[in-house]
Swiss-Prot record:
The protein's name in its UniProt record: ATP phosphoribosyltransferase regulatory subunit
Protein task: Required for the first step of histidine biosynthesis. May allow the feedback regulation of ATP phosphoribosyltransferase activity by histidine.
A single MF term (Gene Ontology): histidine-tRNA ligase activity
Involved pathway(s): Amino-acid biosynthesis; L-histidine biosynthesis; L-histidine from 5-phospho-alpha-D-ribose 1-diphosphate: step 1/9
Organism field: Chelativorans sp. (strain BNC1)
A biological process from GO: histidyl-tRNA aminoacylation
InterPro entries: aa-tRNA-synth_II/BPL/LPL, HisRS-like_core, HisRS/HisZ, HisZ
Predominant location category: cytoplasm
GO cellular component terms given for this protein: cytoplasm
Subunit structure: Heteromultimer composed of HisG and HisZ subunits.
Family listed: Belongs to the class-II aminoacyl-tRNA synthetase family. HisZ subfamily.
Length: 373
C-alpha cells in the first residue's frame, strides 16, 4: 500500500480475506454505456467521460459494482463467489475532491437470499466496528421489492408503477412523481414543437428533434439521458396523463411511505398496513420477515437498526433489500449497499445471477477517525 491509500486500508483488506471475499483488480478506464444505462440519474451526471480512438465512449471508474459484475461475466466464473475491492473512484463534485477511495464486497450467486442480505449487512457493520472502535452507528434499511409490491397491490397502471419505482430512493423525485400522478400538468411546460410531436405520438421524429436540439446547445447525447430515452419518457408521461390516483390509493401510499420503525417492529407494522389498506402483500412480507430473522441471527445491535419504508438508494439497479450505515454528526453515510438481482442479466449474463453487496466511503471513515482523507 502506498501513502496515497488510507492508513487503515490494509486492515480492511485483511478483514475482507477473513470473510472469504477474494480481492479483484478492476481497471480505472471503463466502457461508459453500462453506467449511463443503469447507474441512476444522480451518478450519470457525475461521470467523467472520454472517447477512445475508435469512437467508443469511455469513463473513469465511478463505482465498483457494475465493473465487478462485468468482470465476473467476462471470466465466466462459477458461483457462488464473493469479490472484494479497494481503490479510487472518480465523480464530478461541486465541492471536494473528484477522486476518493471506496472498498466493498459483492456477493454473487448465493441462493439463500435472506441469508446473503443479512451477511452483507453484518460484514459491513463488523468491518466498520474494527476500523472505528467504540463508535455508535445507525443503520437504515429499506426494501425496493416491498415498495413495488405495494404499488402493484394498489392497482396502479404498469407505467406509473415503473415511474414511481424509478423515483424510489430520491424523496424529491418521488414526491414530484406522486404530485404529477394526482394532478397531471399536460404539455403546457414543453416547447411548442416538442409538445406537438408528443401529441402526435411520433417517437422517431421526437427523438430526432431532441438530438438536434442537444447538438445545437452543445450538449453531448452521452452526457446524460440519451435522446431516445428522453423521447420515450415524454411519450410515456403523455400516455399516462389522463390517469388519476384515487384518494384511497393516494392515502394508502402516503401511509406506507410514512412507516419508520425499529426493525423488530417492522414486520408487524407492515402487516397492519396491508390489512388497513385491504391489499395482499404476503409474498413480499414473507421475504422481508425471513431477512429480518437472519439479521437477528448475526447478533447485531437491533436498537440501532431502523426500517424506513420510503428509504432507497439513487442507483437504478437495486431490486430489494437496501441499507446504509452512518454515524451521528455526519450527514453522509459511511456504507451503502443492497440487492441487485437483475443487474447481471442486464449486463449480459447468460442466466440470472442474484447479487448483493456494499461499498464503504473510506474518506468519510477517515474523517470520523480524525484523519485527513
Amino acid at each position: 500500500m502506498t501513502s496515497r491509500y488510507p492508513s487503515f486500508a490494509a486492515e480492511i483488506l485483511d478483514l475482507f480475506a477473513e470473510r472469504e471475499a477474494v480481492l479483484t483488480d478492476i481497471a480505472i478506464i471503463q466502457p461508459a454505456d453500462p453506467f449511463l444505462d443503469m447507474a441512476g440519474e444522480d451518478l450519470r451526471r457525475r461521470i467523467f467521460l472520454t472517447e477512445s480512438e475508435t469512437g467508443e465512449t469511455l469513463c473513469l471508474r465511478p463505482e465498483f459494482t457494475i465493473p465487478v459484475c462485468l468482470d465476473h461475466i467476462e471470466k465466466r466464473a462459477s458461483t457462488p463467489r464473493r469479490y472484494a475491492y479497494l481503490g479510487e473512484v472518480f465523480r464530478q463534485h461541486r465541492e471536494g475532491s473528484p477522486e476518493f477511495f471506496q472498498a466493498g464486497v459483492e456477493d454473487l450467486g448465493a441462493k439463500d437470499r435472506p441469508a446473503a442480505d443479512a451477511r452483507s449487512l453484518a460484514d459491513a457493520r463488523a468491518i466498520l466496528s474494527c476500523v472505528l472502535p467504540n463508535t455508535g452507528f445507525h443503520v437504515t434499511l429499506g426494501d425496493q421489492a416491498v415498495f413495488e409490491a405495494v404499488l402493484s397491490a394498489l392497482g396502479l397502471p404498469r407505467g406509473w408503477q415503473k415511474r414511481l419505482a424509478r423515483a424510489f430512493g430520491s424523496p424529491a423525485m418521488l414526491e414530484a412523481a406522486i404530485a404529477e400522478f394526482t394532478s397531471p400538468q399536460g404539455t403546457a411546460n414543453l416547447p411548442r414543437e416538442v409538445a406537438s410531436l408528443v401529441a402526435q405520438g411520433n417517437e422517431q421524429r421526437l427523438t430526432h428533434h431532441i438530438e438536434e436540439a442537444m447538438q445545437a446547445a452543445g450538449h453531448s447525447p452521452t452526457a446524460g439521458r440519451e435522446p431516445d430515452e428522453i423521447a420515450r419518457r415524454l411519450l410515456e408521461k403523455a400516455a399516462l396523463r389522463s390517469v388519476r390516483l384515487s384518494d384511497a390509493a393516494l392515502n394508502a401510499l402516503k401511509s406506507f411511505l410514512a412507516i419508520k420503525v425499529p426493525l423488530e417492529q417492522a414486520g408487524e407494522r407492515l402487516t397492519a398496513f396491508a390489512d388497513e389498506a385491504g391489499i395482499f402483500l404476503d409474498e413480499a412480507l414473507a421475504d422481508f420477515s425471513a431477512r429480518a430473522e437472519r439479521i437477528g441471527d448475526h447478533a447485531l445491535p437491533l436498537d440501532e437498526i431502523r426500517y424506513d419504508a420510503g428509504f432507497g438508494r439513487p442507483l437504478d439497479y437495486y431490486t430489494g433489500f437496501i441499507f446504509e450505515i452512518g454515524v451521528e454528526g455526519l450527514r453522509q453515510p459511511l456504507v451503502g449497499g443492497g440487492r441487485y438481482d437483475r443487474l447481471l442479466t442486464l449486463l449480459g449474463a447468460e442466466e440470472p445471477i442474484p447479487g448483493v453487496g456494499f461499498s464503504m466511503w473510506l474518506d468519510r471513515i477517515a474523517t470520523v477517525r480524525g484523519e485527513k482523507p
